[in-house]
Amino acid sequence: MEKTVADQISLSDITMKNPARFINREFSWLQFNNRVLMEAANSKNPLLERLQFLSISATNLDEFFMVRVAGLAAQIRAGVTACSADGRTPQEQLDFVLAEISCLQDNQLRELSILRHELKQNNIEIICSAGLSETEKSWIEKYFLDTIFPVLTPLSVDPVRPFPFIPNLGFSIALQLSRCADQHSFIALLPLPTTLRRFIPLPQKDNRFRFIACEDVINLFMRHVFPDYEVEGIGTFRVIRDSDIEVEEEAEDLVHFFETALKRRRRGQVIRIEFEAKMPDHLRQFITNGLAVPEYCINVLDGFLALNTVSEIVSIPRNDLKFAPYDPRVPECICQHKGDCFAAIRQNDIVIHHPYESFDVVVEFLRQAARDPDVIEIKQTLYRTSNDSPIVSALIEAAEQGKSVTALVELKARFDEEANIRWARDLERAGVQVFFGFIALKTHAKMSLVVRREGKRRCSYVHLGTGNYHPINAKVYTDLSFFTTDDDIAHDVALLFNYIAEYVRPNEAMKIAFSPLTLRSRILEHIEGEITNARQGQLAAIWMKVNALVDPEIIDALYRASQAGVQIDLVVRGICCLRPGIPGISDNIRVKSIVGRFLEHSRIFCFGNGVNLPSENALVYFGSADMMPRNLDYRIEILVPVFNKMVRQQILLQVMLANIIDNQQSFDILNDGTSQLITPQRGESPFNAQEYFMANAGLSRMERSFDSSVSHLVALYQQKVKLYKD
């Protein structure tokens, strides 16, 4: 894969006052998406999974345009010239990222070409109409007339008819037509409904899978759409629109506001038009003028548009070209209590590692709460959940059983707003007390609180997680679930629910740190503690695992820690604005990213506390927040300290250690912001963290501080440290 446009900077010029100490946020995100694309090129992955990674990278890029590029364009239109943390104006950032996107899309098309060749070798083929046999042509014509033709709506464009609306991600064919009778010429558009498959499977023969693109089929039978006309020019194009929603603080009815905003979003500003290279110039110019977009919004691609749709091919029954099926385990501690979640949690705090351990435990916890006559109250946050959500069903069942049920439904969850409005109404109809939280703050914390009568007292059971209450995503996202009856944590969670529902500040919180109130200061306090330890000659270390590291204040604190001699290992899946390896500033910081079969999603923070990591003395936290200004200042987030010795060791000695020593699915983040695949050094054993967890699933089953698998991880870490020092 070709080198991308690097963030060119001279390291010798960087100081703690120079904005160049930060990597540009948009560039760093594009580098993450490039890592996803590199998995499409990774021959260790099964072939159809590589095609899926290509689809994911294309979907990611669409969302990047809809939100981030749209945001830059809006700033430019508004005349904003303020610089980003790395010192670039909106216009400079836009120019920078568009150049990077051009490289990324070239790489995507190049990878598709490679994959098509390998797919063909495995009897899977995307053909053009010229490759159809006569039998196939007859079959596909019938398919066209039965399935495609009835839903096509040709739109002619002339001075009498305004340019038609093209929806977000709308895929269309543009045509220059000439009437055979009198050579009258006009332009028409043919939008492709989203209900149509992009790649149509031909009848299977001899275990061969052949597909033809929908637009090729339409082109082949255009005579049915425009009889008595000749096609003089043709090509496909695709539109991407601004899809962000800006919440107005004065909005009185939040549900009504979002319903209206969602309608507006469908007609958002066009931010990108992608044209097929073979489209004639005059057609391209006609569409550009009709949509009234500037030149920078236009992109011409010599290949397939909408690469996200190649995921349709992945579903074919070729399990030999896919990851082997994986069934998550039921946690042993739950099995020991015959599935009784309350009995298991009452005995001891529990940490569960998804997707290696089943998310069904979380669902069952709420189902049992709904059906248990001793449960009197349930409080629940909902940020994202599945279409047929068992979580929502459990809350509805609990309310119908007469229990007091409160649900905090976050309407501002991007691209899930419509679903959350629907869930909120369903819950309210069942008698659930529904809150939407703050208008200006997005509730991102993942919390369940169940209050149960036990004898003469009331006991609170708490679930806290790093991931959403989404059973489908929980099968592919790596996250932590934590169950406890700790009175202080239950007290803090109750305070936070009151804060969200009644705006009562949780000033008496005992253990949990909350954003936007105390989470930032708690992280900074612990970083400063490690700096103090290092300056006093003690050992000092920080481990963090997050999805994004963007916040300038946190990054500068980590720089100061590095300068003081604190050893810092960061596992950052996505955006990382910290620039490692700057002489005198970040020499002691190592940043890596893991991209693999499962999407890394957990947020974990570990501080040495006067000794090296890993250690029983370490301070360990998990939470819902990434290190970004929006998470620290504009969201409701939680940071949960882990005091239970067993749980602390499970998180530190298994999850974090495995992530740090992984050398099979990991990338080093370099000081120019680009990525480099990590390979084992001479004398270093290969280790794949995700495969390790699949083979050794069960944080909740670990009964000793060190079992044989943990000892193995520690040995591998010591090996890695020794090689690093040498």
Curated annotation (Swiss-Prot):
Cellular component aspect of the GO annotation: polyphosphate kinase complex
Entry keyword annotation includes Signal:
no
- From the UniProt record, list the reaction(s) this protein catalyses: [phosphate](n) + ATP = [phosphate](n+1) + ADP
Post-translationally, this protein is described as follows, namely: An intermediate of this reaction is the autophosphorylated ppk in which a phosphate is covalently linked to a histidine residue through a N-P bond.
Amino acids binding Mg(2+): R384, R414
Name the EC number(s). 2.7.4.1
Q: Which GO terms describe its molecular function?
A: ATP binding; metal ion binding; polyphosphate kinase activity
Catalytic residues identified in the record: H444
Instruction: List this protein's GO terms for biological process.
Output: polyphosphate biosynthetic process
UniProt: ATP binding residues: N60, Y477, R573, H601
- Taxonomically, the superkingdom here is Bacteria
Question: What family does this belong to?
Answer: Belongs to the polyphosphate kinase 1 (PPK1) family.
The entry's function note states:
Catalyzes the reversible transfer of the terminal phosphate of ATP to form a long-chain polyphosphate (polyP).
| Protein's name according to its UniProt entry | Polyphosphate kinase
Which source organism? Bartonella henselae (strain ATCC 49882 / DSM 28221 / CCUG 30454 / Houston 1)
